[in-house]
């Protein structure tokens, strides 16, 4: 059974996290553990962007960004999926350079060293050469860089619909099943 870590950096794009968590709860039969790490800045951004910060409604284990006693700080805990959404370029840089100075970068390091699924949903734009090289390094190490770029062939009508095109893709990349629009065959 899947054990999932959702990490929330301080980048703008809290709606992506909210939609992901809502969808993960809707497919609970596909996972046995959901653990969430939210940085202090992510809490502020969430409140600013969404007007709320009630994370307690999600059936999950919550960890502070410096809690290195979290089970997924060790590879022996067998967490097999980590989604960082949104993933700031600062977080990308720390992961790419092996700096395990907080729980998010430590967990990502563990996921990569154990050859498990790391998905970094980057939202910032444009990219400079340092960003591109850091994303390349993570990709070469086995991670997946998934820009938060909505698709429009499904004709989304709302921001939430557009966000769902990205989130559904992330869920699919994680190896989980979700009903979503796909290109007609």
Language model features with spans:
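A cross-family phosphate/adenosyl-ligand binding-site feature
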Residues: 1-119, 123-185
């Amino acid at each position: 059974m899947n054990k999932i870590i959702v990490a929330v950096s301080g980048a703008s794009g809290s709606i992506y996290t909210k939609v992901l968590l809502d969808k993960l709860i809707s497919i609970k039969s596909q996972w046995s553990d959901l653990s969430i790490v939210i940085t202090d800045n992510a809490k502020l951004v969430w409140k600013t962007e969404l007007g709320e910060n009630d994370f307690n409604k999600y059936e999950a284990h919550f960890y502070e960004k410096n809690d290195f006693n979290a089970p997924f700080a060790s590879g022996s805990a067998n967490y097999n999926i980590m989604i960082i959404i949104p993933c700031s370029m600062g977080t990308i840089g720390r992961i790419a350079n092996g700096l395990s100075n907080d729980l998010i970068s430590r967990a990502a390091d563990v996921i990569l060293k154990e050859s498990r699924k790391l998905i970094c949903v980057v939202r910032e734009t444009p990219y400079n050469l340092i960003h591109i090289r850091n994303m390349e390094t993570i990709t070469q190490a086995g991670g997946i860089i998934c820009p938060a770029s909505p698709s429009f062939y499904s004709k989304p009508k709302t921001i939430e619909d557009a966000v769902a095109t990205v989130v559904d893709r992330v869920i699919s990349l994680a190896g989980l099943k979700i009903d979503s629009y796909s290109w007609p065959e």
